[in-house]
């Protein structure tokens, strides 16, 4: 006959983590998820840029779907989708600050959706930073390689839509009450006030 599992720290309860312990384990996992997503985006961005430089000629488009979708190699001194050209070094410093900020948030990250959005932004920002630092004409002022043209939209690379989609995801999460350092949606202020009144009765 099996004996009863004793209660207390030596029993079964000791094997089940508390809510606080479970939440404490989430940031390292979410940081790993964030970095994994960023690594995938960064790898795709670097590989596709290397292939574009190797096989495409500047100023000569290669048709994918007629004239609507083409491979078109350009060197971009501006931000995503060729915006803010002429401010290369400023954009480099801004992107560097974004990367540092994401790493800081990643240490406190609890939400897996925020990990997805931040990972996409981090991977895209680092992909374009590689060009800023290591491509001509000079460090901090390197021109980003863009190679995909769709209709009237400016030529872009893998990093550009990754940053934009990641940013949109974070905005949506914020609007619907999902914070990066909490599990689930945050409670509205009137819900919290109502709960406090109920507890006081």
UniProtKB/Swiss-Prot annotation:
Belongs to the peptidase A8 family. Keywords: Aspartyl protease, Cell membrane, Hydrolase, Membrane, Protease, Transmembrane, Transmembrane helix. GO terms for cellular component: plasma membrane. One of its GO terms (biological process) is proteolysis. This is Lipoprotein signal peptidase. It is found in: Cell membrane. Pathway: Protein modification; lipoprotein biosynthesis (signal peptide cleavage). It holds the Pfam family Peptidase_A8. NCBIfam families: lspA.
